């Protein structure tokens, strides 16, 4: 739900915020490690689309941590940027300013920035916001391919779509409740979304909708 703490939790995992209590631990293949490499796609509405930067420069900025101070990017790094832009389906738009992009093009640009460094984990904060359903299907197909190379943590309010495209879910609403698969009941959803849920079926596609309910005054 809104205000449940999802984005805050992601920023703590990324090291952008410090936890007020407790600590963050990372594990790789069952063993605790000091850190892991991560890519991050922030919420769409946090991006300043008037900032004078091109598609190429945005994706290239994803390699900043791999570049020595006062040194130029290497040929191999520029090759990686071009490869990532092609993978995102953005060829021909390399020099276009982000303010001239459609919602889907901007999301793919930001996703390219998150992926160009070959991270072990990619965190996507509501990646399907402001994109149409046609591109949403392409986005999830692309994420399925990316998931073969790294882990993906995806934040979304769209429970109906999410359950068709993920392997496990966690509900964050003040506290975190992890569910190891996507076979969840209406009762589980109601308990965590704090409103009535009805499960419907249509062919092989599951749909989840809200029942009629009254808001408290």
Role assignments for model-derived ranges:
Residues 14:
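Helix-to-loop junction immediately C-terminal to a conserved catalytic motif
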Residues 22-38:
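Conserved ABC transporter NBD signature motif
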Residues 75-93:
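Conserved ABC ATPase "signature" region
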Residues 97-101, 105:
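Conserved ABC ATPase signature
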Residues 122-126:
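Catalytic Walker B motif of ABC-type/P-loop ATPase nucleotide-binding domains
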Residues 167-182, 200:
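H-loop (His-switch) and adjacent beta-strand-loop-beta switch element
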Residues 183-217:
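ABC ATPase nucleotide-binding domains
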